Swiss-Prot record:
Transmembrane segments: 36-56, 95-115, 131-151
Subcellular location: Cellular thylakoid membrane
Keywords: Electron transport, Membrane, Photosynthesis, Thylakoid, Transmembrane, Transmembrane helix, Transport
Gene assigned in the entry: petD
Topology in membrane: Multi-pass membrane protein
MF terms in GO: electron transporter, transferring electrons within cytochrome b6/f complex of photosystem II activity; electron transporter, transferring electrons within the cyclic electron transport pathway of photosynthesis activity; ubiquinol-cytochrome-c reductase activity
CDD domains reported for this sequence: cytochrome_b_C
Recorded superkingdom: Bacteria
Function recorded in the entry: Component of the cytochrome b6-f complex, which mediates electron transfer between photosystem II (PSII) and photosystem I (PSI), cyclic electron flow around PSI, and state transitions.
This protein's name: Cytochrome b6-f complex subunit 4
PANTHER family: CYTOCHROME B, CYTOCHROME B_B6 C-TERMINAL REGION PROFILE DOMAIN-CONTAINING PROTEIN
Entry-linked Pfam families: Cytochrom_B_C
Record bears the keyword Lipid biosynthesis: no
Length: 160
């Protein structure tokens, strides 16, 4: 018994579907029972085995007890909030810092109207979007690194 069903190209119904661009899943390996009964449980049990194995072989150690009277000099947020924290820390007016953060999604919403190109076209043929996203990526990395440094070195990253 074969696991793959070969298409019968002499079938007029299949040829009509193929002529319309349909019928591509008329043949092939069925999802039931092959995937749902055999492959999915193996992947699920393998994932559980990896998690349990890592938990047994390398358990997470508990750190020191929290002391509310011994706080660090500067409390940092989680790593994914470093760029936002840096904007709020560097901009002198906090309302201006929040306004700068609202300009980011507004600019991304306006971007498709500035560059009127087919959305399915090659991304390398969309220069405005490429420049905006690359600038945003590098600015986010720059602000994230700067948030880890003291405030007097945060804008220059301690290089100047």
């Amino acid at each position: 018994m074969s696991t793959l069903k070969k298409p019968d190209l002499s079938d007029p119904k299949l040829r009509a579907k193929l002529a319309k661009g349909m019928g591509h899943n008329y043949y092939g390996e069925p999802a039931w029972p092959n995937d749902l009964l055999y492959i999915f449980p193996v992947v699920i049990l393998g994932t559980i085995a990896c998690v349990v194995g890592l938990a047994v072989l390398d358990p997470a150690m508990l750190g020191d007890k929290a002391n509310p009277f011994a706080t660090p000099l500067e409390i940092l947020p989680e790593w994914y909030l470093y760029p936002v924290f840096q904007i709020l820390r560097v901009v002198p007016n906090k309302l201006l810092g929040i306004a700068l953060q609202t300009l980011i999604p507004l600019g991304l919403m306006i971007l498709p109207f500035i560059e009127n190109v087919n959305k399915f076209s090659n991304p390398f043929r969309r220069p405005v979007a490429m420049v905006v996203f690359l600038f945003g990526t590098f600015l986010t990395i720059y602000l994230g690194i700067g948030a880890c440094l003291p405030i007097d070195k945060s804008l220059t990253l301690g290089l100047f």
